[in-house]
Amino acid sequence: RAERRRACEAAAGKALAKLGTLKRRLYAYQRQGVERFLRAGRLLLADDMGLGKTTQAVAACHALFRSGRVTRGLLVVPASLKSQWLREWHETSDVAVRAVEGRPEERAEQYRAAKRGFVVIGYEQLLRDFEHVRAFDPEIVVLDEAQRIKNWATKSAQYVKALNPEYRLVLTGTPMENRLEELASLLD
């Protein structure tokens, strides 16, 4: 853990310099969130709705890709938010992104073809396509509306935690609703 932290800290400066190549400027608090993530390599971003969690996630992915720290990443989002993520991504970054969709054989081919860039999938799709996702071997995983993995016992939580990317970014507006265990599950 300490070794990973040192590696992230050492690479953060180069990645931070790439924020200047974004299509839009970040607010100071957004830049601070991205910087914290880049230095730590793992972060639970629990801002209120409307403060730009998605923009911060896209900026972090952009910086890591442009600095050569990652070549491919996975964005797991509620299915209803896929188009919003793609729109926000294209407004913020020029790094390649695609939504994986279609019949099972079409999705399998899309994972194989995505050697560089980022893919957007839904939580249910993660369950159906897990072997393809694992073979895709993302170097960063971003979870939006991460309260979906608050319960350790759910398949979604187990599948997400079975992935082992170098970078993890967890986004939620509600990190803890009822029990401390929910927060612990998000941090795991």
Question: Across the structure, where does each feature detected by a protein language model lie?
Answer:
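Short regulatory helix/loop adjacent to the ATP-binding pocket of P-loop NTPases
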Residues: 159, 174-188
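Short glycine-/polar-rich loops that comprise or flank the Walker A/P-loop
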Residues: 70-71, 95-96, 137-138, 164-167, ...
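Conserved SF1/SF2 helicase motif Ia
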Residues: 44-51, 56-88, 166-167
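Charged, low-complexity
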Residues: 1-43, 87, 95, 113-119, ...
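Conserved helix-turn-beta segment of the N-terminal RecA-like "Helicase ATP-binding" lobe
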Residues: 80-104
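Catalytic acidic motif of RecA-like/P-loop NTPases
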Residues: 50, 124-127, 147-150, 174-175
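SF2 helicase catalytic motif II
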Residues: 134-171
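Conserved helicase ATPase motor motifs in RecA-like P-loop NTPase domains
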Residues: 49, 166-180
